[in-house]
């Protein structure tokens, strides 16, 4: 569960290292974002000479959350931390690589490019 002011790690090579959630998209009073949801975030930490700079306001899709999510078969999945992937307005990732595993729920939300770039889908 990601809410306003949550700090996320970045799971791609866009150049950002830490994101600060500004807004959860999808409804006027929406409080939380889960895996596959889009947030608006500010870049709090970035590497030099990268595609995104510190202070940029970007959109990101949540790919890992520390809060477990239930699956239809009764199992649960959770990750060690909260991570996101920086995306553009066409919902395509800005980076060309994804680091670490991502959840299978991204497939249902139509983020196929992220699924194909990820080294492991859990």
From Swiss-Prot:
GO terms for biological process: translation. One of its GO terms (cellular component) is cytosolic large ribosomal subunit. SMART domains: Ribosomal_L14. PROSITE patterns: RIBOSOMAL_L14. Keywords: Ribonucleoprotein, Ribosomal protein, RNA-binding, rRNA-binding. The keyword rRNA-binding applies. One of its GO terms (molecular function) is large ribosomal subunit rRNA binding. Pfam families: Ribosomal_L14. Binds to 23S rRNA. Forms part of two intersubunit bridges in the 70S ribosome. PANTHER family: 50S/60S RIBOSOMAL PROTEIN L14/L23 (PTHR11761), LARGE RIBOSOMAL SUBUNIT PROTEIN UL14M (PTHR11761:SF3). Part of the 50S ribosomal subunit. Forms a cluster with proteins L3 and L19. In the 70S ribosome, L14 and L19 interact and together make contacts with the 16S rRNA in bridges B5 and B8. Belongs to the universal ribosomal protein uL14 family. This is Large ribosomal subunit protein uL14. It comes from Geotalea uraniireducens (strain Rf4) (Geobacter uraniireducens).
């Amino acid at each position: 569960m990601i809410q306003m002011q949550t700090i996320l790690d970045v799971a791609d090579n866009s150049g950002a290292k830490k994101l600060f959630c500004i807004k959860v998209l999808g409804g006027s009073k929406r409080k939380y974002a889960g895996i596959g949801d889009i947030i608006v975030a500010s870049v709090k930490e970035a590497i030099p000479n990268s595609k995104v700079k510190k202070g940029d306001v970007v959109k990101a899709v949540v790919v890992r959350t520390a809060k477990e999510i239930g699956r239809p078969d009764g199992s649960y999945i959770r990750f060690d931390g909260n991570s996101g992937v920086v995306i553009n307005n066409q919902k395509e990732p800005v980076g060309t690589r994804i680091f670490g595993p991502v959840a299978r729920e991204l497939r249902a939300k139509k983020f196929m490019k992220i699924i194909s770039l990820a080294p492991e889908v859990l």
